[in-house]
């Protein structure tokens, strides 16, 4: 047993997935910083092993959140948006920060599947799974797996910056950091402080600020049950999360629902 809390002999290792010439890494729909960072870590590993590697996400919405677009651009992350895929994925499909068949990820047609995630088990879809829900971020899990392969993460500053930012965002700016492995990764990464500051200070665009402000001004509040309902203009789904996070910091609001219309569907 080690800090990760599981016997190493029962953990899927990355070298078990090297038998495929083609590897597709899929983040969950509406990917956040942790999903993108985790996918990028796996992308770098398989690319450097000579594999034909793709990093993509699917779903109804393309990434439009300012900090995530900057993250992808500044760290040169080759993230593709694949809204539809009719052909079966060639080679191996790895879902990262999500589980194949779960509700937050589009199910791409694939015959060979692996799962790497830091959330509790949702779907049993393959024997090739690495789930460690005791970790604060999936970036930490991917970093751990790269360390097991003696992969030189420290030589890739873009990757180090991505992993650092993934952990930062998924642990609420490190305020929910408790696992020693998360702390080990944070202390060991070679990252660009200026880029982290840029991402941190670009969490919302001026247009998104306007959408959030108008939505909160029109908040419907029930004093008896202390809940709020907010209808937002069309926006990135992550902005709905920002609005709800802010609203839950208001005294007297214990529960909230924030939603937007999507054509004829809410």
Regions from the language model: what does each represent?
Residues 20-86:
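Anionic-ligand anchoring segments at beta-strand to alpha-helix junctions in alpha/beta enzyme folds, i.e.
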């Amino acid at each position: 047993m080690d800090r990760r809390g599981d016997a190493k002999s029962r953990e899927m290792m990355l070298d078990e997935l090297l038998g495929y010439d083609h590897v597709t890494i899929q983040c969950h729909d509406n990917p956040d910083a942790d999903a993108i960072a985790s996918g990028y870590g796996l992308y770098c590993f398989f690319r450097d092993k000579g594999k034909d590697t793709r990093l993509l996400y699917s779903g109804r919405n393309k990434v439009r959140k300012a900090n995530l677009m900057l993250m992808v651009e500044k760290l040169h992350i080759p993230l593709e948006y694949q809204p539809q895929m009719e052909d079966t994925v060639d080679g191996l499909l790895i879902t990262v920060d999500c589980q194949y068949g779960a509700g937050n990820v589009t199910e791409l047609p694939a015959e060979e599947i692996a799962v790497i995630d830091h959330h509790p088990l949702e779907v049993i879809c393959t024997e090739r799974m690495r789930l460690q829900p005791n970790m604060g971020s999936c970036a930490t899990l991917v970093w751990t797996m790269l360390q097991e392969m003696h992969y030189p993460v420290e030589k890739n500053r873009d990757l180090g910056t991505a992993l650092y930012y993934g952990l930062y965002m998924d642990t609420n700016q490190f305020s929910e950091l408790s696992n020693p492995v998360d702390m080990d990764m944070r202390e060991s990464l070679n990252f660009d402080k200026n880029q982290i500051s840029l991402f941190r200070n670009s969490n919302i665009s001026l247009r998104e600020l306007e959408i959030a402000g108008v939505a909160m001004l029109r908040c419907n509040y029930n004093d008896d049950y202390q809940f709020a309902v907010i209808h937002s203009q069309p926006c990135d789904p992550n902005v709905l999360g920002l609005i709800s996070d802010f609203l839950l910091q208001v005294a007297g609001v214990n529960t909230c629902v924030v939603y937007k219309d999507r054509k004829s569907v809410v």
